[in-house]
Design a protein with these regions (language model features):
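Sec-dependent signal peptide recognition
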Residues: 1-4
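C-terminal motif of bacterial Sec signal peptides marking the signal peptidase cleavage site
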Residues: 6-10
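Thioredoxin-like thiol-disulfide oxidoreductase module
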Residues: 45-100, 104-116
Length: 117
């Protein structure tokens, strides 16, 4: 099985894609494919742990379901499922994509959320 994981230098480099149309100062977007939910267990486990550790950072948290239509700004940020994006100042500062272990999701995302405290 092909594993597709993208880490942006410990999630510190800003991605070229922006969320400008969304006006997100700080936010977390989880792109979910409900037809392949079994592949997303590690993401849900990581999200539960992250929400427990950083409850204040989940004020602007949204699940983006693959089978639904969304604003073009949300759609332009990602086209791979599952994926977890962390947005700061309308830029993607952390992106984990594809099948990943819980720790491979937790580490980069925690590093970014820790900076927000």
């Amino acid at each position: 099985m092909l594993v597709n994981i993208i880490f942006l230098s410990s999630c510190s480099i800003q991605n070229e894609r922006t969320a400008a149309g969304l006006n997100i100062e700080k936010g977390i977007l989880f792109y979910s494919d409900e037809n392949n939910i079994q592949e997303e267990d590690s993401y849900y486990e990581a999200l539960i742990e992250l929400k427990h550790s950083y409850p204040g950072q989940f004020d602007n948290y949204k699940i983006i379901a693959k089978n639904q239509e969304y604003d073009s700004a949300i759609a332009s940020l990602n086209d791979t499922y599952p994926a977890l994006l962390v947005i700061k100042d309308n830029k993607v500062v952390c992106k984990v994509v594809g099948i990943a272990k819980k720790d491979d999701i937790l580490t980069p995302v925690s590093n970014v959320l820790e900076e927000w405290n």
